[in-house]
UniProtKB/Swiss-Prot annotation:
Disulfide bonds: none annotated. This is Large ribosomal subunit protein uL1. The gene is rplA. InterPro entries: Ribosom_uL1_bac-type, Ribosomal_uL1, Ribosomal_uL1-like, Ribosomal_uL1/biogenesis, Ribosomal_uL1_3-a/b-sand, Ribosomal_uL1_CS. GO terms for biological process: regulation of translation; translation. Part of the 50S ribosomal subunit. Signal peptide: none annotated. One of its GO terms (cellular component) is large ribosomal subunit. Keywords: Repressor, Ribonucleoprotein, Ribosomal protein, RNA-binding, rRNA-binding, Translation regulation, tRNA-binding.
Length: 232
């Protein structure tokens, strides 16, 4: 049997595809999967009971993961004047104004998150078709459009992440690394689920957390019992 086949067989020993697990059980299953040569990202995919086509049922926000993401972010700041210096001193990786806008228009996207000062949004808004689908567009709702550039950068470095429901009403979010302690992964997921529950639109009816799946980069997608998350 090939190495790939052996890996799949090893995963299936610990996992029943037809079952929903507690959060702790699911994390343990991911950790018991045959190892790979890199530190895998732990992702969650949450199907929400919303109609994202309606403006009053769109979900977007930000939350602090108490244990961070385990990822070194490449932070870009759209700014001019003294705010460029502030961005440099705060540790931004890329900063600029019209020059960055033009660079992104030409296809460059080597960054993970963007911050912008309000005066830059007229130009940054022209990048909507590029940044929007990639969830890279700065927005006041998540604190990435701000005059306090240093604070925004500091929060991102400390584990602040954005979440957004796509056109199918699904949020896909990285919540840490598989090398984290199980308790750290669990705490991060609970922080995210709590933020999502608080962000429930008043117009959304019926079951809100329709499904909740946790996976690692090379591991299976494991269904979580949503009742645990609603109660936490």
């Amino acid at each position: 049997m090939t190495k790939h086949g052996k890996r799949i067989r090893g995963i299936l020993k610990n996992y029943d595809f037809s079952k929903s697990y507690s959060l702790r059980e699911a994390i343990d299953i991911l950790k018991q999967c045959p190892p790979v040569r890199f530190d895998q990202t732990v992702d969650v995919s949450i199907k929400l009971g919303i109609d994202p086509k309606k403006s009053d049922q769109q979900i977007r926000g930000a939350v602090f993961l108490p244990n961070g993401t385990g990822k070194t972010l490449r932070i870009l700041v759209f700014a001019s004047g003294n705010k460029v210096k502030e961005a440099v001193e705060a540790g931004a990786d890329f900063m600029g104004s019209d020059d960055l806008v033009e660079k992104i228009k030409s296809g460059w996207l080597e960054f993970d998150v963007a911050v912008a000062t309000p005066d830059m949004m007229r130009e940054v808004g022209k990048l909507g078709k590029v940044l929007g689908p990639r969830n890279l567009m700065p927005t006041p709702k998540t604190g990435t459009v701000t005059t306090d550039v240093a604070k925004a950068i500091s929060e991102l470095r400390k584990g602040k992440i954005e979440f957004k429901a796509d056109r199918a009403g699904v949020c896909n979010v990285g919540v840490g690394k598989l090398s984290f302690e199980s308790s750290q992964i669990k705490e991060n997921i609970e922080a995210l689920s709590s933020a999502l529950i608080k962000a429930k639109p008043p117009a959304a009816k019926g079951q809100y957390l329709v499904s909740f799946t946790i996976s690692s980069t090379m591991g299976p997608g494991i269904s979580i019992d949503t009742r645990e998350l609603m109660a936490s």
